[in-house]
Amino acid sequence: NHLYDLIILRDVIEHVEDQPRLMARLAELLAPDGVLFVAYPPWRMPFGGHQQMAVSRFAAHCPWLHLLPGPLYPWALRLAGETPGKIAGLLEIRDTRISVRKFRRLAAGAGLRTVTERFFLINPHYEAKFGLKPRCLPRLLEVVPWLRDFFATTCFCLLQRQE
């Protein structure tokens, strides 16, 4: 069994069905002084449902569309002309969604502690994709959980084993 000084998990955890098992395994693989870097889009952010992957311009550019309750989300996707396969993929992301609160619980449950956590209003990888400069979430939005959850486009988190 090899232990790792650094493990990077970027934009992955929101696609994993068994998130507690993943986090527990990552904690097992982490060296005692090792660092786990996790980046994830909080579920309630404007495109937390990954609907930007939709084919229709409406669905791909409609912020918070994924937050429609129950059957309204797949109905809206069908109405926009999405294929059954695309809808199934987007609903799968809804099933594996991750919020800031859920991520913190998963980390603690795996015996990990947060070293640092940074929230971004403009995700750093949007610079390469869209030419937008990264911007941290303003402190006022960061300290109010519901505002943070709706406006943070990504969270960068460094974790270590609890001592």
Question: Locations of the language-model features?
Answer:
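Short catalytic micro-motifs in class I SAM-dependent methyltransferases
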Residues: 10-15
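S-adenosyl-L-methionine-dependent methyltransferase catalytic module, highlighting the catalytic core
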Residues: 17-25, 35-160
